[in-house]
């Protein structure tokens, strides 16, 4: 049986995914960076690329910070090809198409007041993971998935040039093909009327967590979700089991503040029924879905948290060392492209971490 090396695989991948518009040198550098990132101990430093690739570390640093290559077109192509790959799987298998949107913080060391070349674009951001404000870069991400397959659709730095996180979310939605019927999954920070309107304009459905103080209008009476939950008799809730866990759920369907009509689920873990701190609220724009299906679909949002952990662990996003903001923006694009390659570029579709380890093993054995 013919054995195809990782270098041959990635050249084939670039051709099949229509990345041949890049000239030979940018293609070569991108391929070297992607393949270097699969090696054990990779930390996202230019010295890692220099040790694994044929060029010096400064060559890769210059390529990311100042190299002349069409990163905008590469981003558009990577988005289109990733979406098309998952969309075709969804149609073939008859499984729903999900797009999860979230953000994370990449912590960095606070620079000294005397630092002459501090890292560009870093600032203070609230980290949900650490539960406090930390110094670093905030990254906005979107993944597209169906079944057991998920690909990185977008990975961009939060900065004034890109607008607010809501602006970046709206830009993601505008970039999607029309009438895909996808379910857009997000946490309570992103669930708002403008995002819902953008989803509906694209023929998509929104399933998002909501803050418990959001205003509902049961029987025309203005009240918050938390107050409504507290006023209901326990008998109004019914059990819903999702992935082995049981929740007590009340379904509200009607208007919200600035939203004409949607489904809202008030949910408690069965063991914490009635506890105010345990209340979770979810909004769904697709009224045809059952309560169980809404919660099951929303559980797919966890995939983006797994992606953040994998990129920090394997792709060096936790320890990268580039100073220029442009270099980081391009590095994030390369990480998204690498995710695509390790998931789909080795002859068959596999989870990202499995593809990365397969590529690593092939290098060791070659």
Please identify what each model-predicted range represents.
Residues 1-18, 94, 112, 146-366:
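Single, function-defining residue in the core of a domain
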Residues 1-73:
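Gly/serine-rich nucleotide phosphate-binding loop at the start of the catalytic core
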Residues 22-30, 128-134, 322-332:
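Structural motif
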Residues 32-37, 140-143, 335:
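Contiguous, well-ordered alpha-helical segments that form the cores/surfaces of helical PPI scaffolds
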Residues 32-47, 80-83, 123-132, 225-229, ...:
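Short N-terminal helix-initiation segments at or just after the protein's N-terminus
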Residues 37-38, 85-90, 173-177:
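Hydrophobic, Leu/Ile/Phe/Ala-enriched alpha-helical segments that form helix-helix packing faces
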Residues 43-46, 57, 95-100, 139, ...:
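A common structural microfeature
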Residues 65-147, 246-250:
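Active-site-proximal, Lys/Arg-enriched surface segment
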């Amino acid at each position: 049986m013919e054995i195809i090396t990782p270098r041959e695989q990635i050249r084939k991948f670039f051709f099949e995914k229509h990345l041949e518009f890049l000239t030979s040198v940018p293609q070569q550098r991108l391929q070297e960076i992607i393949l270097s990132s699969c090696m054990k101990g990779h930390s996202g430093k230019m010295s890692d690329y220099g040790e694994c690739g044929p060029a010096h570390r400064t060559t890769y640093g210059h390529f990311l910070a100042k190299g002349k290559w069409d990163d905008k077109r590469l981003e558009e192509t990577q988005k289109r090809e990733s979406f098309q790959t998952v969309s075709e799987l969804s149609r073939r298998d008859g499984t729903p198409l999900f797009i999860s949107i979230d953000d994370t913080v990449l912590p960095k060391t606070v620079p000294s007041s005397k630092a002459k070349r501090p890292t560009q674009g870093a600032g203070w951001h609230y980290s949900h993971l650490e539960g406090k404000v930390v110094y670093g870069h905030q990254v906005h991400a979107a993944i597209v998935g169906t079944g057991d397959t998920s690909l990185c659709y977008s990975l961009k730095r939060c900065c004034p040039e890109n607008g607010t996180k809501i602006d970046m979310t709206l830009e993601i939605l505008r970039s999607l093909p029309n009438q895909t019927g996808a379910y857009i999954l997000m946490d309570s920070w992103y669930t708002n009327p403008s995002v819902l309107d953008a989803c509906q304009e694209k023929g998509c459905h929104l399933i998002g967590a909501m803050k418990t103080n959001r205003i509902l209008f049961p029987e025309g009476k203005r009240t918050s979700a938390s107050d409504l939950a507290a006023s209901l008799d326990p008998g109004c809730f019914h059990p819903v089991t999702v992935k082995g866990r049981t929740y007590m759920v009340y379904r509200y369907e009607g208007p919200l503040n600035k939203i004409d009509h949607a489904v809202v689920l008030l949910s408690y873990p069965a063991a914490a029924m009635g506890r105010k701190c345990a209340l979770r609220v979810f909004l769904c724009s697709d009224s045809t879905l059952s309560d169980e299906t809404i919660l099951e679909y929303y559980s797919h949002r966890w995939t983006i948290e797994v992606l953040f952990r994998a990129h920090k662990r394997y792709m060096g996003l936790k320890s990268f060392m580039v100073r220029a903001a442009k270099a980081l923006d391009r590095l994030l694009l390369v990480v998204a492209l690498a995710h695509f390659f390790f998931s789909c570029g080795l002859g068959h579709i596999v989870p990202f971490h499995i593809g990365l380890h397969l590529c690593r093993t092939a290098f060791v054995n070659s």
